[in-house]
């Protein structure tokens, strides 16, 4: 099944743009830039969108302008309008359980406490079987510090690692369309920025 919608999760507004919780949007922004397809605000989809062609496949890009916990509103609207099935969607999000410098593809699973994923699962009819790109941001080490951590900006050294992982993820996304998910996954999962 080809991917028809790539989503980058984020909170809207300049004050959140550089926070760890917006790592998914950094990836979609990079894809849009690499493929010369600038994102434009499209109110009916509650987000910034663009249309790209990857290996002959028509793909939509989406960065919701809702707050993170309402991401499903944007994803659901676009999936419904274009008749896109959950397994044709790739959602990029920040991942506490991976260190900065690592990104991994995954199909399905729970939301792991991520409010963006939780809302998307709910708005897709409680179907969790969409693809994810998990962008490692690391963990603060204490559950009570998670909210402040994801809404904080990474130090320059960590930002560099996250950016490198996102670059590799963008290259591997293009590889996925060229040579399949298995090859793309194998390459991405052996990458670790130094």
Swiss-Prot record:
It holds the Pfam family Pept_tRNA_hydro. Its EC number is 3.1.1.29. TRNA binds at residues 16, 67, 69, 115. This is Peptidyl-tRNA hydrolase. The keyword RNA-binding applies. One of its GO terms (cellular component) is cytoplasm. Keywords: Cytoplasm, Hydrolase, RNA-binding, tRNA-binding. The active site is at residue 21. The gene is pth. It is found in: Cytoplasm. One of its GO terms (molecular function) is tRNA binding. HAMAP family: Pept_tRNA_hydro_bact. The keyword Hydrolase applies. Monomer. It comes from Salmonella heidelberg (strain SL476). It catalyses: an N-acyl-L-alpha-aminoacyl-tRNA + H2O = an N-acyl-L-amino acid + a tRNA + H(+). The record marks 11 as: Discriminates between blocked and unblocked aminoacyl-tRNA. It comes from the Bacteria. NCBIfam families: pth. Belongs to the PTH family.
């Amino acid at each position: 099944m080809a991917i028809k919608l790539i989503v980058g999760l984020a909170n809207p507004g300049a004050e959140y743009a550089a926070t760890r919780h917006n790592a998914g949007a950094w990836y979609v922004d990079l894809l849009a830039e690499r493929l010369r397809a600038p994102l434009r605000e499209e109110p009916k989809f509650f987000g910034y969108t663009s249309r790209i062609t990857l290996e002959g496949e028509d793909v939509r890009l989406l960065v919701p302008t809702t707050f993170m916990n309402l991401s499903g509103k944007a994803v659901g609207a676009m999936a419904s309008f274009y008749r896109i099935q959950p397994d044709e969607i790739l959602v990029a999000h920040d991942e506490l359980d991976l260190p900065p410098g690592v990104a991994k593809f995954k199909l399905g699973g729970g939301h792991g406490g991520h409010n963006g994923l939780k809302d998307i699962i709910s708005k897709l009819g409680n179907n969790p079987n969409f693809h994810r790109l998990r962008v490692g941001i690391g963990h603060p080490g204490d559950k009570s510090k998670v909210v402040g951590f994801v809404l904080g900006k990474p130090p320059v050294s960590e930002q560099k690692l996250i950016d490198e992982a996102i670059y590799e993820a963008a290259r591997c996304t293009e590889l996925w369309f060229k040579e399949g998910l298995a090859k793309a996954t194998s390459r991405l999962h052996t990458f670790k920025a130094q």
